[in-house]
């Protein structure tokens, strides 16, 4: 017998799952990423390196900054492009803006209805309208940062190898800093709400993140420093996304692995919240990825004013994007809101000849299946099929999957 979750709701993209029942016992769980492959690597082949980040920004509207930054970092390594410190800090600001936008969308509009027992955020408005309004306000602020640095709210084209097409003014940055301070109280409230959520899903034993908080030159897996090609990618016949394993174990990426592997990097009230809820987070239940996102949202709002002050006090040096070689190979590691994102290029005479991208949801797919399997085993026979399906979707949503991103890498 197969119990089908016909379509995941309140997630980005199209996916479904099957729970396999044999002789009255739960035997398997399969997550089917059914959204069609998009072949973004193919689109980059033969393209001038300068055009590639703008193409990669089209992979996802929600996390285009991460794709753009990972792309330019890979190109800069391949072609020996120097990047001023102020450019790096403006990119960091853009990434925090994206985390603010994406986490607000997920927490307030997609995951919060699960906490309060509603089918969707619209149904919450009569009793929890202020929370919905706060979430939309925070999301709009994150988009304002993305528009300022990336050029557009979605699919921006301002992030370039070595720098930017347009640089923000001092007045624009100061406005962003002040606005961020006014939103901290909202994020503080949402942390407490998600701390009350019931644990569930599999335990993510193999945690993976970039070596620095938002990017790095290598990955950290349970404290061990590795390169992405040491993680095995395995195609599966029922899904357009591969499974990822490290030494035979599924990996887990996202806000929870970031906080557990690199939580010493955060400061302020978010750091105190991290310590207060550390026991929950260290249980590594995937459901607490929501709590981790809430803490990270708080930190992002605290970090933005600090970062703006650093940028303005040091001054903005504009990068020129000058290359030192026309051929080379580079890997860009960036933390997208949902976890580790990899862009890898080989460039010859200024043209991309080989391209590979791995997204957070692709890394997480196998652990998502194991989480559904564990939860189905716990609930089958004691809950109605309808209630079990609802709970399984709660587990899926905790991963905050971006399914449109996950299918782009299937190759012809």
Swiss-Prot record:
The keyword Cytoplasm applies. GO terms for molecular function: ferredoxin hydrogenase activity; hydrogen dehydrogenase (NADP+) activity; hydrogen dehydrogenase activity; nickel cation binding. Optimum pH is 8 for hydrogenase activity at >95 degrees Celsius. Signal peptide: none annotated. GO terms for cellular component: cytoplasm. Its cofactor is Ni(2+); Fe cation. InterPro entries: Hydrogenase_lg_subunit, Ni-dep_hyd_lsu, Ni-dep_hyd_lsu_Ni_BS, NiFe-Hase_large. It is found in: Cytoplasm. SUPFAM superfamilies: HydB/Nqo4-like. Gene3D superfamilies: Cytochrome-c3 Hydrogenase, chain B (1.10.645.10). It comes from the Archaea. The keyword Hydrolase does not apply. Its main location: cytoplasm. It catalyses: H2 + NADP(+) = NADPH + H(+); H2 + NAD(+) = NADH + H(+). Ni(2+) binds at residues 60, 63, 402, 405. Part of a bifunctional enzyme complex that functions as a hydrogen-evolving hydrogenase with sulfur-reducing activity. May play a role in hydrogen cycling during fermentative growth. Activity exhibited with NAD in addition to NADPH. The alpha and delta subunits form the hydrogenase component that catalyzes the reduction of protons to evolve hydrogen. NCBIfam families: sulfhyd_ShyA (NF040828). This is Sulfhydrogenase 2 subunit alpha. It comes from Pyrococcus furiosus (strain ATCC 43587 / DSM 3638 / JCM 8422 / Vc1).
């Amino acid at each position: 017998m197969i119990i089908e979750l016909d379509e995941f709701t309140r997630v980005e993209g199209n996916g479904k799952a099957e729970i396999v029942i044999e002789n009255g016992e739960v035997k398997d769980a399969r997550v089917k990423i059914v959204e069609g492959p998009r072949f973004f690597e193919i689109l980059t082949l033969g393209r001038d390196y300068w055009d590639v980040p703008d193409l990669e920004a089209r992979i996802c509207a929600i996390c285009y900054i991460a794709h753009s930054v990972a792309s330019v970092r890979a190109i800069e390594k391949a072609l020996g492009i120097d990047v001023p410190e102020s450019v790096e800090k403006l990119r960091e600001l853009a990434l925090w803006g994206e985390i603010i936008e994406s986490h607000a969308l997920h927490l307030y509009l997609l995951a919060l209805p699960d906490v309060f027992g509603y089918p969707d955020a619209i149904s919450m408005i009569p009793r929890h309208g202020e929370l919905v309004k706060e979430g939309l306000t925070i999301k709009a602020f994150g988009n304002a940062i993305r528009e300022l640095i990336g050029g557009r709210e979605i699919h921006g084209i301002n992030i370039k190898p070595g720098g930017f097409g347009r640089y923000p003014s001092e007045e624009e940055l100061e406005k962003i800093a002040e606005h961020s301070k006014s939103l901290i109280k909202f994020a503080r409230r949402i942390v407490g709400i998600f701390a009350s959520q019931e644990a569930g899903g599999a335990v993510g034993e193999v945690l993976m993140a970039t070596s620095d908080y938002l990017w790095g030159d290598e990955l950290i897996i349970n404290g061990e420093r590795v390169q992405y090609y040491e993680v095995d990618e395995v195609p599966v016949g029922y899904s357009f996304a591969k499974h990822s394993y490290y030494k035979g174990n599924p990996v887990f990426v996202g806000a929870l692995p970031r906080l557990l592997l690199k939580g010493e990097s955060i400061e302020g009230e978010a750091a105190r919240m991290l310590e207060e809820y550390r026991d929950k987070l260290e249980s590594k239940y995937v459901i607490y990825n929501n709590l981790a996102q809430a803490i990270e949202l708080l930190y992002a709002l605290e970090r933005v004013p600090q970062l703006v002050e650093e940028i303005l006090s040091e001054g903005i040096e504009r990068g020129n994007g000058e290359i030192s070689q026309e051929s080379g190979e580079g890997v860009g590691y960036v933390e997208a809101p949902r976890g580790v994102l990899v862009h890898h290029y080989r460039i010859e005479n200024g043209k991309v000849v080989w391209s590979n991208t791995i997204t957070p949801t692709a890394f997480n797919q196998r652990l998502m299946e194991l989480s559904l399997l564990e939860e189905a085993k716990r609930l089958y026979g004691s809950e109605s099929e309808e209630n079990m399906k609802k709970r399984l979707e709660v587990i899926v949503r905790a991963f905050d999957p971006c399914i449109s991103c996950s299918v782009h890498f299937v190759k012809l």
